[in-house]
Amino acid sequence: MQPLIDYARSFRQQTAARPEEFARLAEGQAPQALFITCSDSRVIPSLITGARPGELFELRTAGNILPPYDPEQPTGEAATIEYAVEILGVRDVVVCGHSHCGAVGALVRGDDLTAVPAVRDWLTHAAPRADGTKADGDPAIADAAQSHVLAQILRLRSYPYLARRLDAGQLRLHAWFYEIHTGTVLAHRPPADTFVAHPARPVRAAPP
């Protein structure tokens, strides 16, 4: 913990080199995308995308799970999505799953989650394996995690305000998958119904 505290103490001095950027952020935000991903500490949206402060509106949940739309039972997840789209006018929504996912792995293996009832109940919102079989190992978990991302994309389409914008061509949904062990970001391609690596492009240099 101490290294984190030390960095926080010095952050003000580090930002002093870019006063205009941070002053501009105080005037408001206009993020390019809503980035929905897992709470896993190994998945860092700004690191994966090279986003600067103010460019991503983030929603992180255990297993990048989204609850079903229910106007009678509002959730923090639904409120975050609604705010990003209806108030901030975000036109792109990314759901990014990842390899070695603990939540999906627990579902695939059929782990006993009695000791963590909140986790157990939250995972009921996830997409189980379509074939209902128990599998294990990184490839099986990766396959299930990719299917899970697509299930969450489908769930987003059931949110009425998102459906309206999708029908009007005002919103795009993106299904991504991040390989922790390689750093590769895959995107789902509907025609082939497969996840493929993003084509290489010049990389924006990281800030000093």
Residues covered by each model-derived region:
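N-terminal-biased segments
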Residues: M1, A33-T37, S41-V43
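Divalent-metal-activated hydrolytic enzyme cores
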Residues: M1-P31, N64-R91, G102-P208
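Thiamine diphosphate
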Residues: A26-Q32, D40, R52
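Structural motif
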Residues: Q32-L34, E55-F57, R91-V94
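Short hydrophobic/aromatic-rich motifs at helix boundaries and adjacent loops
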Residues: F35, R52-P53, T133
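Short beta-strand segments
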Residues: I36-C38, R60, V94-H98, H174-E179
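Gly/Ser/Thr-rich loops at beta-strand to alpha-helix junctions
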Residues: D40-R42, H98-A103
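Catalytic core of membrane glycerolipid acyltransferases/transacylases, capturing the structured
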Residues: S41-A62
